[in-house]
Amino acid sequence: MNIKEQIAKIRAQGYDQIHAEARLCQDIIIQALAKSTLNQNVTIKGGVVMRSISKDARRATRDLDIDFIRYSLEDSHIDNFIKEINCLDRISIMRIGDIEELKQQDYHGKRIHIKVSDTYGNSLISKIDLGVHKDLSIKQEEYCFDICFTETNASLLINSKEQMFTEKLRSLLKFGSFSTRYKDIFDLYYLSPLVDKKFLMLCFEKYIFNDTGMKENNLEDIIRRVTKTFENSSYRRKLKTTETNWLKKDSNEVLEGILHFFKKQM
């Protein structure tokens, strides 16, 4: 595979240069993971899944988010992880730089930077955020990713739509109008008609209602908190002007749609 040629093909699909490079790098890692011995020890999450299920280049993301399943986040295990996914013909995958501790809003994990190279002297540098999927009672979904450089799909586990919805909502509930994860709002709106209501309520129980660090104990509490956040004028103003509105929908319509979704669950 020639990295430079593949990037040109991806750009022809509507991606800019940065996101074309990221898409190719992500697909290389996903393909390598699917072929590796660790394919049942990881679950893919975040923007890569959102972009894949929506099939919308506007939801493209530069990073790759992975949670380990029954696999340690220790540095030595991360290095073994890289060794295991360096398994594609004529493609080299290696870690560069240090393994970083990662602490963001409502997220703790590690970050690694990787270099992907072909045999033509081309290379890409990207980053992977790594965490741990701790609650094994929340089943992961088997999903086939379209890989941009081959007609063969890559089958891996992903966070379900219901889990993604719940985790995005959980962050919004915790930080309220101080949340800066505006893209999550448009993701919530997109996911709302796609989730299974029964499984969603199970995720709410696990990640929100039964979490002693959360203040919400039922749907009424969620609606009350979300309504208060959405009524904040500063939050609405920032949401209206954000560049992360990948749906290109009116932000007021999006907020109303999310609230309507919650009220329908009552």
Show which residues each predicted segment covers.
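Structured mid-to-C-terminal alpha-helical surface segments
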Residues: M1-V42, S52-A60, L64, F68-M266
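Glycine-rich beta-strand-to-loop/alpha-helix junction loops that act as flexible
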Residues: I44-V48
